[in-house]
């Protein structure tokens, strides 16, 4: 039998329910009656807008995960036109903003290419500024030849700038109104106007404390360079121009997106660029943000790891700089002629570039800090911006002779035991007036009888003239192509393909016939052959590993932004092979070994007592017209277990032997075990 509910409990429950109803009614009365008007006004004056949330760009790392380029966030000031032009005096607000920026020590962006004080004249313009001005003049229906004064007169009238303002203040207001207005002119494709980039907290605080309307604070990311090395490889970023926008807009990029402009930043844009998000931002009447709701989270870009080793890159740049500047400092007849140069080191087993150095170089951290900095670098006589390692084209000189040797051996023109007598002069075509000499003839002696190994050691022109005379030029060119000379290397950065001297090349360049002398000169690396330092390093690696040419891709891997997920791992790609017998490789490799280790070798002075056995070939590329020769040098090491191949080029360096020390200094670093302070633990026991 159920127990009856006591009357007291029913009374208590009824009281509680009554109390809850009373509280609810009072709260509802306060919300709708007492505070209803205030809530209505707050809601009526609140503005919700959809805004883009910038995604961070991915970082660039070296092969061991050391950060080369990352991001740093910064606060920018941008105008809110809807808010600004609802104010009673937008021009006065703009002037107030500009003055506040200056008083806080910041700098604002004024895109009007007119001097800031009378007499008003046009300033020097970038191509973007010219396009912007042309579009504005067309919009304003002003003549393309309108003067700066006429332009400002139009701006004063169009933007209703009060005549009470001084000429300088009028110019300030006109510049800001011009910068805002051009964003709304059709087909100009300008990025969003950022009034102040990387605004200081003092400025932001001052503007907010004084309730200055018409602007917003946005967050963006700028690239931070953690090294001054590898400038030609890393590249830089920037806002899109109109031409780039036509390409990237199909991929969903907004006009204000930052994209890679050069180097790895451009080559790996698809990995580095993130996907922007969106958010609903609510503001009250004072412009204060009262709420942010993400409708799409931004997706940051991925980490890109290069094949470059930062320590080896440092060693390459230091060795190259030291070597060239030492050559310049010597009081010799040709020291003043010494120019730029390059050093490239690649992994023999994979073809991966480990270091790509140029001289002169530049510092990405300071290049774009000011127009003066960029102008000084871009207009320098020695062309620091020129990527000699990838774009420079140089005659290989005698460094080409191993290629001629392999071609001759493989085609049966010679064997490893064939001896050719050097008499100092190649006399076969003497009756036609053509009798080229060996380099040693100037000393009044000869090389005597040389086999192919000895001929490489001695760099005997007569031997290689004889081989080249028996090889059709197209056959020699086929071997050069298999070695990658005159071919794309597979690197993702802009490169020159160079050219192998052939009948077709001469016809194209000079529209003249091919003669036997052209074949002889091509066989010793002269004539019309031009190759890049990167090609020469990969060629040397192919000799070292016995005929396998790999891609020179500088992409090692791609990982997610936080490094937790592997997205892509680049594997060594074989581009071509040079098929010949092992005994032929051994003969050529031994010849290069003797260049560095036999007293008769041209690099013996540099490597004869070196702690690691090196195989090398020197080259002297004649330029004619009384110019000082270019110096070319290739080597690989260790000789009996090749790991690294190096190519060095110095413009007007006189002779290949004179730059062997640059490669030696680099190898010193290569064969030095890294210390705990500079290397991940997994590297400590490696001799690379």
Report residues per predicted region.
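Flexible helix-coil linker/hinge segments at domain or subdomain boundaries
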Residues: 672-682
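Amphipathic, well-packed alpha-helical segments that form the structural scaffold of globular domains
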Residues: 245, 273-276, 284-287, 317-325, ...
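Short alpha-helix boundary/capping segments
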Residues: 85, 89, 308, 580, ...
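Membrane-proximal periplasmic segments of bacterial cell-envelope enzymes
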Residues: 1-272, 276-297, 333-334, 339-342
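Conserved, well-ordered alpha-helix/loop/beta-strand core segments that scaffold catalytic motifs
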Residues: 289-341
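Solvent-exposed, polar/charged alpha-helical surfaces in well-ordered, non-transmembrane soluble domains
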Residues: 91-99, 201, 205, 209, ...
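Solvent-exposed coil/turn segments that connect beta secondary-structure elements
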Residues: 36, 58, 66, 73, ...
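Beta-lactam-recognizing serine transpeptidase/beta-lactamase-like catalytic domain environment
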Residues: 69, 75, 283-296, 308, ...
């Amino acid at each position: 039998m159920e127990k009856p509910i006591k009357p007291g409990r029913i009374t208590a429950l009824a009281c509680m329910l009554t109390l809850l109803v009373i509280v609810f009614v009072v709260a509802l009365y306060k919300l709708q009656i007492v505070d209803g008007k205030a809530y209505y006004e707050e809601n009526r004056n609140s503005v919700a807008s959809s805004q883009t949330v910038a995604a961070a760009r991915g970082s660039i790392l070296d092969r061991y995960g050391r950060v080369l380029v990352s991001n740093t966030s910064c606060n920018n000031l941008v105008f809110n036109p809807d808010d600004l032009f609802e104010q009673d005096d937008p021009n006065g607000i703009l002037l107030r903003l500009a003055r506040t920026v200056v008083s806080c020590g910041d700098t604002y962006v004024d895109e009007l290419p007119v001097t800031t004080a009378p007499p008003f004249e046009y300033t020097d313009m970038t191509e973007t500024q010219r396009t912007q001005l042309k579009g504005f003049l067309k919009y304003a229906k002003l003549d393309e030849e309108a003067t700066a004064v006429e332009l400002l007169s139009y701006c004063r009238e169009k933007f209703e700038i009060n005549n009470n303002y001084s000429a300088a203040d009028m110019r300030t207001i006109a510049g800001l109104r011009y910068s805002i207005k051009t964003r709304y002119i059709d087909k100009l494709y300008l990025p969003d106007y950022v009034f102040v980039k990387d605004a200081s907290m003092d400025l932001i605080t001052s503007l907010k404390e004084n309730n200055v309307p018409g602007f917003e604070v946005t967050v963006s990311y700028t690239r931070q360079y953690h090294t001054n090395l590898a400038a030609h490889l890393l590249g830089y970023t920037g806002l899109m121009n109109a031409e780039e926008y036509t390409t990237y807009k199909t991929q969903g990029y907004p006009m204000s997106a930052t994209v890679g402009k050069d180097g790895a930043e451009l080559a790996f844009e698809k990995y580095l660029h993130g996907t922007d998000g969106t958010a609903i931002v609510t503001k009250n009447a004072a412009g204060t943000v009262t709420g942010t709701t993400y409708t799409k989270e931004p997706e940051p870009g991925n980490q890109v790891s290069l094949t470059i080793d930062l320590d080896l890159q440092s060693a390459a740049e230091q060795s190259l700089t030291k070597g060239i500047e030492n050559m310049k400092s010597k009081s010799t007849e040709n020291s003043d002629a010494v120019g730029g140069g390059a050093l490239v080191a690649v992994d023999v087993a994979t073809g991966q570039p480990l270091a790509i150095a140029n001289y002169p170089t530049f510092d990405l951290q300071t290049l774009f800090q000011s127009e003066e900095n960029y102008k000084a670098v871009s207009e320098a006589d020695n062309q620091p911006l020129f990527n000699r390692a990838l774009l420079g084209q140089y005659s290989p000189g005698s460094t080409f002779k191993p290629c001629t040797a392999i071609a001759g051996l493989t085609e049966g023109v010679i064997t490893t035991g064939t001896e050719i007598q050097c008499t100092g002069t190649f006399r076969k075509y003497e009756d036609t007036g053509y009798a080229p000499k060996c380099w040693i003839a100037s000393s009044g002696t000869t090389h005597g009888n040389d086999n192919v190994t000895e001929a490489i050691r001695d760099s005997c022109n007569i031997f290689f003239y004889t081989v080249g005379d028996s090889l059709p030029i197209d056959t020699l060119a086929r071997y050069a192509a298999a070695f990658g000379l005159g071919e794309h290397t597979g690197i993702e950065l802009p490169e020159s393909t160079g050219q192998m001297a052939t009948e077709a090349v001469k016809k194209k360049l000079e529209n003249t016939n091919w003669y036997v002398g052209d074949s002889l000169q091509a066989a010793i690396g002269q004539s019309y052959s031009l190759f890049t330092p990167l090609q020469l390093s990969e060629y040397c690696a192919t000799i070292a590993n016995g005929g396998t040419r790999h891609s020179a891709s500088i992409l090692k891997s791609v990982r997610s932004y936080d490094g937790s997920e592997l997205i892509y791992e680049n594997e060594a790609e074989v581009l071509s092979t040079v098929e010949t017998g092992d005994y032929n490789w051994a003969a050529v490799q031994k010849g290069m070994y003797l260049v560095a280790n036999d007293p008769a070798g041209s690099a013996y002075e540099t490597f004869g007592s070196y702690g690691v056995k090196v195989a090398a070939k020197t080259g002297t590329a004649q330029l004619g017209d009384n110019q000082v020769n270019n110096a070319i040098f290739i080597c690989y090491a260790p000789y009996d277990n090749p790991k690294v191949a190096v190519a060095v080029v110095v413009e007007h360096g006189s002779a290949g032997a004179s730059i062997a020390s640059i490669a030696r200094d680099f190898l010193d670093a290569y064969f030095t075990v890294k210390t705990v302070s500079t290397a991940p633990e997994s590297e400590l026991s490696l001799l690379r």
